[in-house]
Design a protein with these regions (language model features):
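N-terminal capping segments
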Residues: 1-56, 155, 162-179, 205
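Aromatic- and glycine-rich peptidoglycan recognition patches
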Residues: 4, 101-186, 194-195
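...with weaker cross-activation on analogous glycine-rich loops/strands in unrelated enzymes
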Residues: 8-11, 56-130
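Short glycine-aromatic motifs
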Residues: 20, 71-82, 152-155, 202
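Short glycine-/small-residue-rich flexible loop motifs, especially phosphate/cofactor-binding loops
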Residues: 48, 68, 194
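Cationic, hydrophobic amphipathic alpha-helical membrane-interacting segments
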Residues: 182-185, 199-205
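Residue-level detector of alpha-helical secondary structure
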Residues: 191-194, 198-201
Length: 206
């Protein structure tokens, strides 16, 4: 086992979860139970759970725009188009043409391929390229892109946050569901409903 509080340990924990499937109810997972956000889209809960198991400090939120905003506030963020990601970084996604024009998914970088692509472990995604990439119900290891690349992988990573390593004891209190910025505050239950509807093809207008 890798040393607690390290990127290696975070990756080890995440990889051990690959193959986990939600259920029996929709969006029901041990990750959501840990963050007290069960039965909601759980990619953020997965990252928080893995970080807690590994003793790594990440933003205390399951709302993906809020997590990105927190990393930016701490100066621990780098945009994808200029990034040099490292294993253990937290990747934030905005999938083109999925009906949600904002950061809407998060995962853990396990390897940088040094060609504009990375391998990530993500909760609540799909192993099938045709399945929902941000509400797919599985923990999967995925090949993702943050820059244009010769592999032809679609660019979906907006940027990366770098966690604080050092064997932290995280609490199991409910992470904030809101963003760190006033402009992005959304009730997590409402946002979860919006994301579910848009993933099924419904158009949500303001």
């Amino acid at each position: 086992m890798a040393e607690q509080g390290t990127a290696e340990r975070l990756i080890e924990v995440a990889l051990a979860e690959v193959g986990t499937v939600e259920g029996p109810k929709d969006n029901e997972t041990k990750y959501g139970k840990f963050t007290k956000a069960d039965f909601q889209p759980w990619c953020g809960s997965f990252v928080n759970w893995c970080a807690n198991e590994a003793g790594v400090k990440v933003p205390n939120t399951v709302y993906t725009p809020g997590g990105a905003a927190a990393f930016k506030k701490k100066g621990a963020w780098i945009d994808g188009d200029v990034a040099d990601p490292e294993p253990g970084d937290i990747a934030y996604f905005d999938f083109p043409s999925d009906g949600v024009d904002r950061i809407s998914h998060v995962g853990i970088v396990v390897k940088d391929n040094e060609d504009g692509t990375v391998w990530c472990v993500e909760g609540n995604t799909s192993g099938d390229a045709k399945g929902s990439q941000r509400n797919g119900g599985e923990v999967c290891k995925k090949l993702r892109a943050f820059k244009k690349n010769k592999k032809g992988i679609m660019v979906s990573i907006v940027g990366f946050g770098r966690p604080k390593f050092g064997n932290f004891t995280n609490t199991t209190s409910k992470p904030s569901g809101g963003s760190a910025s006033k402009s992005a505050k959304v009730d997590p239950k409402i946002q979860a409903a919006i994301d579910l509807l848009t993933s099924k093809g419904y158009k949500i207008t303001k």
